[in-house]
Amino acid sequence: LVAGELAPAAGSIACSSRPYYVPQHLSAAGISAVGVLGVADKLDALRAICGGSADPRCYDILADDWDVEARCRAALDHWGLPHVGLTDPVDALSGGERTKLCLAGISVHNPSVILLDEPTNHLDTSGRRRLYDLIRASRATIVVVSHDVALLNLLGTTCELSAKGLKVYGGNYDFYRERKRIEEEALAQQVDSEQTALRLARKKAQEVRERQERRMRQGERHKDQLPRILRRTMKDS
Protein backbone atom coordinates (compact mmCIF):
# COMPACT_ATOMS: atom_id res chain seq x y z
CA LEU A 1 0.00 0.00 0.00
CA VAL A 2 2.71 2.51 0.97
CA ALA A 3 4.75 1.56 -2.09
CA GLY A 4 1.74 2.34 -4.26
CA GLU A 5 1.45 -1.17 -5.71
CA LEU A 6 -1.99 -1.65 -4.15
CA ALA A 7 -4.80 0.84 -3.70
CA PRO A 8 -6.32 1.12 -0.21
CA ALA A 9 -9.85 -0.24 0.13
CA ALA A 10 -10.72 2.84 2.18
CA GLY A 11 -9.01 6.03 3.24
CA SER A 12 -5.78 7.32 1.73
CA ILE A 13 -2.01 7.24 2.23
CA ALA A 14 -0.07 10.51 2.20
CA CYS A 15 3.71 10.65 1.82
CA SER A 16 5.88 13.76 1.55
CA SER A 17 7.90 12.19 -1.29
CA ARG A 18 7.79 9.09 -3.46
CA PRO A 19 9.09 6.10 -1.45
CA TYR A 20 11.92 3.98 -2.83
CA TYR A 21 10.78 0.36 -2.63
CA VAL A 22 13.03 -2.71 -2.41
CA PRO A 23 10.75 -5.75 -2.91
CA GLN A 24 11.41 -9.18 -1.46
CA HIS A 25 10.97 -10.79 -4.87
CA LEU A 26 11.85 -8.85 -8.02
CA SER A 27 9.97 -9.71 -11.20
CA ALA A 28 12.82 -9.43 -13.69
CA ALA A 29 11.41 -10.63 -17.00
CA GLY A 30 12.61 -8.37 -19.81
CA ILE A 31 14.03 -5.71 -17.48
CA SER A 32 17.56 -4.32 -17.63
CA ALA A 33 19.65 -3.11 -14.70
CA VAL A 34 18.88 0.54 -15.45
CA GLY A 35 15.20 -0.38 -15.61
CA VAL A 36 15.35 -1.67 -12.05
CA LEU A 37 17.29 1.41 -11.00
CA GLY A 38 14.54 3.53 -12.52
CA VAL A 39 16.82 5.67 -14.71
CA ALA A 40 16.44 4.05 -18.15
CA ASP A 41 14.75 7.12 -19.64
CA LYS A 42 17.39 9.45 -18.20
CA LEU A 43 20.24 7.36 -19.59
CA ASP A 44 18.58 7.21 -23.01
CA ALA A 45 18.20 11.00 -22.93
CA LEU A 46 21.80 11.49 -21.79
CA ARG A 47 23.17 9.30 -24.56
CA ALA A 48 20.99 11.03 -27.13
CA ILE A 49 22.31 14.42 -26.02
CA CYS A 50 25.90 13.16 -25.99
CA GLY A 51 25.27 11.84 -29.50
CA GLY A 52 24.36 15.32 -30.72
CA SER A 53 20.59 15.47 -30.18
CA ALA A 54 19.11 18.89 -29.47
CA ASP A 55 15.63 17.55 -28.75
CA PRO A 56 14.26 19.59 -25.80
CA ARG A 57 12.40 16.53 -24.57
CA CYS A 58 15.72 14.84 -23.85
CA TYR A 59 16.82 17.80 -21.73
CA ASP A 60 13.52 17.76 -19.87
CA ILE A 61 13.88 14.05 -19.11
CA LEU A 62 17.50 14.40 -17.99
CA ALA A 63 16.62 17.40 -15.77
CA ASP A 64 20.30 18.42 -15.41
CA ASP A 65 21.16 15.03 -13.89
CA TRP A 66 24.39 14.84 -15.87
CA ASP A 67 26.20 12.42 -13.57
CA VAL A 68 23.39 9.84 -13.39
CA GLU A 69 25.37 7.22 -15.32
CA ALA A 70 28.43 7.68 -13.11
CA ARG A 71 26.28 7.38 -9.97
CA CYS A 72 24.74 4.16 -11.24
CA ARG A 73 28.12 2.66 -12.01
CA ALA A 74 29.52 3.69 -8.61
CA ALA A 75 26.47 2.27 -6.82
CA LEU A 76 26.76 -1.10 -8.58
CA ASP A 77 30.47 -1.27 -7.77
CA HIS A 78 29.78 -0.43 -4.11
CA TRP A 79 27.28 -3.29 -3.82
CA GLY A 80 29.71 -5.80 -5.28
CA LEU A 81 28.26 -5.79 -8.80
CA PRO A 82 31.17 -4.54 -10.95
CA HIS A 83 30.44 -7.32 -13.45
CA VAL A 84 26.87 -6.10 -14.06
CA GLY A 85 26.45 -3.76 -17.00
CA LEU A 86 23.81 -1.06 -16.90
CA THR A 87 21.99 -2.58 -19.85
CA ASP A 88 22.39 -6.21 -18.75
CA PRO A 89 19.15 -8.21 -18.35
CA VAL A 90 18.20 -8.77 -14.73
CA ASP A 91 16.85 -12.27 -15.26
CA ALA A 92 20.46 -13.48 -15.57
CA LEU A 93 21.21 -12.36 -12.00
CA SER A 94 20.88 -14.42 -8.82
CA GLY A 95 18.40 -13.53 -6.08
CA GLY A 96 21.12 -11.89 -4.01
CA GLU A 97 22.39 -9.89 -6.98
CA ARG A 98 18.88 -8.67 -7.74
CA THR A 99 18.48 -7.48 -4.15
CA LYS A 100 21.85 -5.70 -4.31
CA LEU A 101 20.79 -4.07 -7.57
CA CYS A 102 17.63 -2.74 -5.92
CA LEU A 103 19.62 -1.52 -2.92
CA ALA A 104 22.07 0.22 -5.26
CA GLY A 105 19.18 2.40 -6.37
CA ILE A 106 19.15 4.00 -2.92
CA SER A 107 22.54 5.57 -3.65
CA VAL A 108 21.35 6.63 -7.12
CA HIS A 109 18.16 8.36 -5.96
CA ASN A 110 19.00 9.33 -2.35
CA PRO A 111 15.31 9.03 -1.34
CA SER A 112 13.88 10.45 1.87
CA VAL A 113 11.58 7.43 2.37
CA ILE A 114 12.82 3.84 1.90
CA LEU A 115 10.70 0.66 2.05
CA LEU A 116 12.57 -2.63 2.54
CA ASP A 117 10.70 -5.95 2.31
CA GLU A 118 12.82 -8.79 3.78
CA PRO A 119 15.98 -7.21 2.29
CA THR A 120 18.49 -9.67 3.79
CA ASN A 121 16.80 -12.90 2.69
CA HIS A 122 19.11 -13.43 -0.30
CA LEU A 123 22.12 -11.36 0.77
CA ASP A 124 25.51 -12.82 1.57
CA THR A 125 27.56 -11.68 4.57
CA SER A 126 29.18 -8.76 2.75
CA GLY A 127 25.82 -7.64 1.38
CA ARG A 128 24.27 -7.68 4.84
CA ARG A 129 27.17 -5.68 6.22
CA ARG A 130 26.75 -3.04 3.51
CA LEU A 131 23.03 -2.83 4.24
CA TYR A 132 23.62 -2.46 7.99
CA ASP A 133 26.15 0.31 7.29
CA LEU A 134 23.67 2.05 4.98
CA ILE A 135 20.96 2.02 7.64
CA ARG A 136 23.33 3.33 10.31
CA ALA A 137 24.43 6.21 8.10
CA SER A 138 21.09 7.06 6.47
CA ARG A 139 19.01 10.04 7.52
CA ALA A 140 16.01 8.79 5.56
CA THR A 141 12.80 7.38 6.99
CA ILE A 142 13.24 3.61 6.60
CA VAL A 143 10.37 1.14 6.92
CA VAL A 144 11.52 -2.49 7.16
CA VAL A 145 9.66 -5.79 7.18
CA SER A 146 12.15 -8.46 8.24
CA HIS A 147 12.92 -11.50 10.38
CA ASP A 148 16.58 -10.42 10.65
CA VAL A 149 17.05 -9.54 14.33
CA ALA A 150 20.40 -7.81 13.73
CA LEU A 151 18.73 -5.58 11.15
CA LEU A 152 15.69 -4.84 13.31
CA ASN A 153 17.94 -3.85 16.21
CA LEU A 154 19.36 -1.04 14.05
CA LEU A 155 15.95 0.63 13.86
CA GLY A 156 14.56 3.09 16.38
CA THR A 157 10.90 2.07 16.30
CA THR A 158 9.20 -1.32 16.13
CA CYS A 159 5.61 -1.80 14.97
CA GLU A 160 3.56 -4.92 15.65
CA LEU A 161 0.75 -5.73 13.21
CA SER A 162 -1.89 -8.12 14.51
CA ALA A 163 -5.61 -8.79 14.18
CA LYS A 164 -6.10 -6.01 16.75
CA GLY A 165 -4.38 -3.46 14.53
CA LEU A 166 -1.00 -1.72 14.51
CA LYS A 167 0.82 -1.08 17.78
CA VAL A 168 3.94 1.09 17.91
CA TYR A 169 6.80 0.45 20.33
CA GLY A 170 9.38 3.19 20.85
CA GLY A 171 12.54 1.17 20.44
CA ASN A 172 14.42 -1.52 18.52
CA TYR A 173 13.63 -5.23 18.42
CA ASP A 174 15.27 -6.03 21.76
CA PHE A 175 13.25 -3.22 23.35
CA TYR A 176 10.10 -4.60 21.72
CA ARG A 177 10.78 -8.11 23.04
CA GLU A 178 11.29 -6.78 26.58
CA ARG A 179 8.08 -4.74 26.42
CA LYS A 180 6.20 -7.77 25.10
CA ARG A 181 7.57 -9.87 27.95
CA ILE A 182 6.38 -7.29 30.49
CA GLU A 183 2.96 -7.07 28.80
CA GLU A 184 2.57 -10.85 28.70
CA GLU A 185 3.57 -11.18 32.37
CA ALA A 186 1.10 -8.44 33.32
CA LEU A 187 -1.60 -10.14 31.26
CA ALA A 188 -0.84 -13.49 32.90
CA GLN A 189 -1.06 -11.87 36.35
CA GLN A 190 -4.34 -10.22 35.39
CA VAL A 191 -5.76 -13.53 34.18
CA ASP A 192 -4.56 -15.25 37.35
CA SER A 193 -6.10 -12.52 39.52
CA GLU A 194 -9.39 -12.74 37.64
CA GLN A 195 -9.42 -16.53 37.96
CA THR A 196 -8.68 -16.25 41.69
CA ALA A 197 -11.46 -13.68 42.09
CA LEU A 198 -13.82 -15.95 40.15
CA ARG A 199 -12.97 -18.93 42.38
CA LEU A 200 -13.54 -16.83 45.51
CA ALA A 201 -16.85 -15.55 44.14
CA ARG A 202 -17.98 -19.09 43.37
CA LYS A 203 -16.89 -20.25 46.82
CA LYS A 204 -18.75 -17.36 48.44
CA ALA A 205 -21.87 -18.12 46.39
CA GLN A 206 -21.65 -21.78 47.42
CA GLU A 207 -21.36 -20.81 51.09
CA VAL A 208 -24.41 -18.55 50.77
CA ARG A 209 -26.41 -21.35 49.14
CA GLU A 210 -25.36 -23.81 51.85
CA ARG A 211 -26.43 -21.39 54.62
CA GLN A 212 -29.75 -20.83 52.92
CA GLU A 213 -30.27 -24.58 52.58
CA ARG A 214 -29.44 -25.12 56.27
CA ARG A 215 -31.93 -22.43 57.28
CA MET A 216 -34.59 -24.01 55.08
CA ARG A 217 -33.98 -27.46 56.60
CA GLN A 218 -34.10 -25.99 60.12
CA GLY A 219 -37.36 -24.23 59.27
CA GLU A 220 -38.87 -27.48 58.01
CA ARG A 221 -37.90 -29.27 61.25
CA HIS A 222 -39.52 -26.50 63.30
CA LYS A 223 -42.72 -26.90 61.31
CA ASP A 224 -42.73 -30.67 61.92
CA GLN A 225 -42.12 -30.22 65.65
CA LEU A 226 -44.77 -27.54 66.29
CA PRO A 227 -47.91 -29.77 66.17
CA ARG A 228 -46.40 -32.33 68.57
CA ILE A 229 -45.58 -29.61 71.08
CA LEU A 230 -49.10 -28.27 70.90
CA ARG A 231 -50.60 -31.78 71.44
CA ARG A 232 -48.33 -32.43 74.40
CA THR A 233 -49.33 -29.11 75.96
CA MET A 234 -53.00 -29.91 75.52
CA LYS A 235 -52.56 -33.34 77.18
CA ASP A 236 -50.77 -31.84 80.15
CA SER A 237 -53.55 -29.35 80.68
Regions found by a protein language model. Give the residues of each.
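ABC ATPase nucleotide-binding domain signature region
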Residues: 1-59, 147-148, 156-163
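ABC-family P-loop ATPase nucleotide-binding domains
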Residues: 25-95, 101, 195
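Conserved beta-strand-loop-alpha-helix hinge in the C-terminal portion
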Residues: 30-40, 161-199
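Flexible nucleotide-interacting loop at or near the entrance of a catalytic core
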Residues: 52-67, 82, 186-237
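Conserved catalytic motifs of ABC-family nucleotide-binding domains
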Residues: 110
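Catalytic Walker B motif of ABC-type/P-loop ATPase nucleotide-binding domains
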Residues: 114-118, 123
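Conserved catalytic loops of ABC-family nucleotide-binding domains
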Residues: 134-144, 152
